[in-house]
Amino acid sequence: MTYNNNNNYLAPPLMTSTSTSTSTSTPTSTKTSPLNTSSSSNILKSNSRNPSPNNPTNIGNSSGGGGVSSNNSNNIVYSNSNNINTSTFHYNFNVKFNEIVNSIAVNRAGTLVCLGGKKSLQVVDLELLKSVRNIPQQSKWEVGVVDWNSQSPNLVASSSNQDTFIWDIENPKYPLLGQFSSHQRAISDLSWSLFDNNILATTSADSFVNIWDLRTPKKAVKFKSLKSHILGAIQVKWNRFNSNVLASAHESYLMIWDIRKDSQELNTAVHSAKVYGIDWSHRDEKEILTCSQDKTVKIWNYPSPKPKSTIITSNPILRAKYLPLGSGGIVTISDRGENHIRLWDSATSDYSTPVETFIGHTDNVRSFDFRVRSSQNDNDIQIVSWSKDQYLRLWKLDDHLKDLFNIEYIPFTPLNLPTTTTTTTTATTTTTNNSTSEMLNESTDNNNNTNSLNSSTLLSTPNLESSINSLNMELTIEQQQLDDSNTPKDLEYELKIIQSKVIDKYLKIEQVNLFKRTCVVICTIPNNYQPDDDNNNNNLNNLNNNNNTQDNIDNNDDNNNNELIDSTTVQIRFSFPSLYPSTYPNLEFIPHACTTPLKTNLLIKSTLNELCAFKSSQSKNCFEQCLIELVKLVKQYILDEKPKNTSINITETNNNNNNHNNSVQNNNNNNNNNNNNNNNSGGGFLKNVFSKSSKAVEVVKQPFINLRNSSGRIDISQQQQQQQQQQAATTSTSSSSSSSSNTQQQQQFLTATVSNKGGTVLSKSPTSPRMFEQYRPGKTNKTNEIIFLNNYKDSNEEQLPLSPILTNLNNNSNNNSGSGGGGSSNMNASITTSTTTNDQVSLSVHRNSYRIQENYPCPRLCGAVFGGCGKLIVFRNTIITNIPNNNKNSDNSNNNNSSSSNKNSDNSNNSNNNSNNTNSSSSSNNGGIANVGGGSSSTSSLIHHHLQHLHLNQPQLNLLSLSLSSSSSSISDTTNNTSNTTQNIQNTTKNINPPRTYKELLNILSTTNNTIKNNITGNNNINSNSNTTNNLTSPNPNRLNRLNEKQPYSSSPFNDNPLINDYKNNIFGTPSTSHSFLASPQPSSPISFMNHIDTLLDDSENNLMTMDNNNNNNIVNDEETQQLVTSSSPTFSKSSLNNINNTTNNSNNNSSNSNNNSNSNNNNNNNNNNNNVNNNNDNNNGNGKSLQKTMKIIDISTLSLLNVNLANSYILSGKPVEEICKYNSELAEKENRKDLVKLWNTLGMITDSKLYLKQLINQQQQQSHFGFSGSSGSTGMGGSSSTGIASSTGSNSIRRPTKLESSLHQSISMSNLGQIPSSASSSYSQTSPSLPYNQLYHQTTLQTPSSPSSQQQQIQFYQQQALQLQQQQQQQQQQQREIQFKQTQLIQQAQIEDNGWPNHALGRKLVKSLIDYYKKLEDVQTLATISCILILAANQLQKLKNGESITSIGSSSSSSSSSLASSPLTFSAGGGGGGSYSPMFNFSAISISAPMGIDDMVSKQKGHLYNYYGQQQHSHYHHGYQHHNIHQTYGSHPNDVITYDPNLCLLDPNNSKIYDYYRQQYSDLLYRWGLLEKRAEVLKYIQHKEVDKGINFSIECIKCNRKLNNFYCNNCKIYAVKCSICNISVRGLSSFCLYCGHGGHTNHIKGWFEKQTKCPTGCGCTCSFNLPFIQQQQYQQQLQQQQQQLQQQLQLQQTQQQQPQHYQQHRHSMSGTSHYHQQQPHTHNYQQHISSYAHTTYQPHTPRNNGQPVLPQQRRYSISTFDPQQEQDHEKFNHGGGSGGGDAIFHDILFSPNSSSSSSSYQQQTKNSHQYHHPSNPYMFSN
């Protein structure tokens, strides 16, 4: 069990009872090994401790014999050494492995132990106590010894015969690092150096001690070989303090070596027999112990030749080791004679008895090691041992032993238990060899260690079985009940014990997930269960047969119950909390697996919860008691339900028998009986009421199908097959009998079965419970059987039909067995056999079949699911039933009615109805369409009724019906007829319930609803004295045309399998007859939305279509009728359509004959009637039911706060913030979002620049310097509001200011803005300087005091006046220019306060409250736009603070781009009351540049985004945006980069990442809406961009497939790149194609592609267009040479021929940018072609490109070799004046059909393409 660094529990799954190497493997749920990740190495290494000679007690190594592991898992799940918890460290544990293990070794961290087995190495996690890694041995010899590297915790060394293996347990695929043969004889021991992880010492029977340097494991270097010259060596150990000293044991000699010398330092005989073990002291450098076959352990202090002390034992010693902690402790195991582990104290002089004996192993102990936990104040140690009894045991040291050996520790106190005093009583325990016991949890003392496991300390105890403390030496474990007084309270331990026993044969634990702490149990009990059956389970509780019993429970059931019987299943999921058993588990029923009703499940759950609560109050385990109680409750439920079912069946049978002759008149009795049974239609199941105590009843036995064991196919014996065939023959024969005989047989069978007193021996009755045989491929399913299969079929099995719920059963190919004879319609539905036909019963593609349970839920017939972008998908599956037409007698009666008069038609019609009632039992189920809700048989009305919404209970119902009879038997317009029809339908629908189970649905789909037929034919007496044409609705041509448009797939809406896909109106599925719901208005509220959905689905189905013979149009439902319940079936057959047409014609003709009483039309009526009868006969097979599938996609965007119209119209940049807020506010008002109107007005006010100004120049200074003047109505912000709010809101009307506006006005007043006094006067004339001269003349004439006498004087006077006016005009213009200049200067000198307004209560706090509000509403659209606008406002303020010039947006002529100079800032002079003022500055002209466009970003190769002031961040999203006159792309000037100061922004800088998240989510929403430009605009506001990551190319070794960082594989010692031509590894310059990955030596590849274009490997890749070969410098030299050749050719052509004058001028204009063509007649035209062609951009060629290959924009290398053949062709093409050669790479480009130029155009192209490095360059060159 493991805890991670956060103390989270990581629990393993349960292990099997016995772990074997061939069958046991770690479940897949535990394959979360850190060794499979790159961080595994860090986990391992972090657990290790650095060795130090000053701290030798931290080292614990192992030695011993070999062994084999058992687990096939390749992953390791292990714990952190720093978190060795108390789950396994403070207790004794026992783990069973059914393998032979010779040696074990514990890693330094104390978390893993390696078992050296016969064929593999097995790594066991000591916290999980299970195998987590199994490494197969690479040798035919078994593993001799293993040792764990103390420096590198991932390295393990093992020996096999003469070879040494080095393993890396972190590597899941290739764990073997190296293998080398180190000796001539078998290796007896090996030891890693404690100071250098690369040094390994091995010893062998060849008497040599070899020391290896493993820096390169495959080429291990033996740098030292020590020769003993004596017999073979047994063990070797390194000194714990000196890295140069090691000791080895040779027979009876001990040798100590110094590797710096060639000879040994000590060579002496230490024992009289063979030395088997040596170990260096952890405290003294010179101290070493030896153990021998002479039954002694000697302690030496070399170089003294005498032992320091000697321990004498009674048995030969196999191994002896010092305790890693404390002082003086020595642990020994015996070679033979005893099976105990003894602990000795070397500090005392009494060595006669050990201080502790660990008893538990039942066979010789072969190896042991220490598990150490060492810290500053808490140290602990545990002994890990392995014995021949195949048990791995963990032994803890008691506290008194720790005190004895001076081990510092913290006493362990179990939680939830009182602290007890530690005793020193020595207690030993032993266990018998129990084959069923896999892991035993033992204790060695009498204290509270055993019983202290609780929910807090042992959340992850492994799969253990407990042995109870006892002072006795013998302890047998038999069937253990979970005794709460002496059992550890651990979930895993409890589950293990429960799995090892059989609580009940009907109970099974299906799934255990200890990581999630869940357990799924299933209880399956047959319905014929008897209490006597429990006696058969008494012999199943023997622990010696646990493994076989649990696996053979189903097999026992097969032997005991060979008949296929119905059963009751309950499946529960137990979820155990972390504090279990202090808190009780959570119980959850799995609905689809439970066959019990909901009421029973709730009762079971409440009972189990009470039991769990009682146990948890006492902190006791409750799981086992819950399982026992669960089985009892299910059994009690079956026993309680059995008498109820029996009595119901008997009652139903009697009622049916009594009412057989009067079934038509007493339909209510049958309906009441149907309500008492779940199966209210034909094909119901009969409950099993067999008594096992009776031997008189013979039942045809069927093979029991194991529902849970679906791994194999169950074969049926020949005898059983014969019985099944006889059963099928009997069933088919009996089904064709009369109804009376069937009833008598049913009653007799039920009576004999239930009473069973007369000893009557009965065979299988045709109406007995249906018995299902095993499905076999290739065999046709018999009648009356519904097979449900539960496993995938084999590949060679035949294809089976679809599921019954998806199969359209309206056109059954065979008649129902109960339809003939007329009596089956009167039978009760619960005891009649199913009439499901052979062809329509579908078998799913599974293998093992089992019976459909009674309580399987019905599939969902309707529902709705939300889709993306504000869509709701609503679907409905409607069951439509074919209601039978009238038979021939009714047709004849109708014919007689047609010949009679109107007065006699009533009597005839009544008699016709009576005849229908009389012959209803013999009528066939054919003809018209109706639903399960009911319908009129006499009129064959198309009545559609949804199963789950019965809307037929209205008191008044207008029912439009279509007359299908020969008479005018349509619905009358009178209220009486309508109410009678409505009442009949209501009576019928009350007896029909929606299907609640899957079986009921199958019965509805497969059988004919005879009950509806009888009800309607017995009660509907419709008057037909009125005219038929008056009852029918007039045809609607518009509706008809629209219907035809919606069905383009067929001219007629009636198809055999119609399917409509109306993408325009989002309707899919089977077509309905009307689509009036398509144009329905969208909902505007959730309440209207619910009504809208119901209207949509009802309108799509509740429609009527009739065929008018005169107009040839479809008659649709009346527009004025709101309650219309009739509808058409989407599955008319052709015969049904003809029948409708004929009956319609017949009805019309009958109506005319009835009115006119003409005899000439009677013959036509008779002919029509005959045709009608024939059509009815042809349509005998048209009965059945079908599913009308309708799906509607509804737009519910109006219900969501996200608005696509606002998203498409919002402005987020390109204008001043005030204008943006005003514009967005108007958009929100149009969308009726009043909250957004207030929001945008508020944002416009709080982002006003005046709120940030620290102070302004007072009004007197402004007047004295600039002489401002203006009219009282002139304002700078477009309004005359005293608070300046009207300008921001864009309204000049007088209104009461809001609270926010009042607060803002107060804030502005407090910011030293002041008000303009009313005494301010104008310093210049208000006469406009732009008045024309004639206006000035007339004005001056009025100012003349008197006119002179002469005309000449008047002219001079006027001229002087005009001159004065001109001078005044010039002065005024000069003053205006000065005013504008001073205003600009004043703006630049204005000081903006950084931390003033944002920290105000109406600043960031208000913004935060707005964001929190819309965050609760989850309106990501508003959140994103708010964050964008506030950043834009901060950017504008930043420009004002920096004094930058503000430019306009868009073109200079735009109306919205007026500069600041064109909008003079003026003050209002006041006047009137109050002294109003206008804002000092007009900030409406402040604007910024729009985001960067795509073209400019490509040219600059990088774009800058909005970011904090003073920072630049490169764009990761290359999206531009252009939008009319609002937005403009970036220029190349650096000032175009938009920056802002976070101190000026109203957004909290600490939440910038959250705001980026809002923008990112909103951008994703815009992407789904298709608003890509808007998305790009929002993405530019994102501040935290992802760092651009380049393309990383990985190279894999051609031999081991490892991914390499360079071109050399250290594992294989080869170069990874292999040449595709010479097949030799490439060491130098290489070139390869990035599309196919093939390449090689550059020279080889270049030589290949001089003549070839395809890849040399034959992969088909055109590498010649993807593979560079030479450097760019060489390629540029080639281009220069070609350019010089072209210039020489042009000069030669100029001397030979004179050029036209206009050509010479054009030549000078194009010099330096283009080249001339070699062909003289086309030089001028070609030059023009070059001027346009030279700027063409080319994309790199890829193998997926089917066009001509083109040159990429960037090539690092190219080919310098030319093809001579291509060169000649090129010269011929250019008439001998070509470029002199064609590059093999560019040949197709130069001579492509779309290019008529030579390489001169190509030079210009390549010159432009090499100006920058394109990021999408797919070429790579390596050296």
UniProtKB/Swiss-Prot annotation:
Residues 749-768, 827-840, 1710-1725 have a biased composition (Polar residues). SMART domains: WD40. Keywords: Repeat, WD repeat. GO terms for molecular function: signaling adaptor activity. One of its GO terms (biological process) is positive regulation of TORC1 signaling. The keyword Repeat applies. This is WD repeat-containing protein DDB_G0292056. It comes from Dictyostelium discoideum.
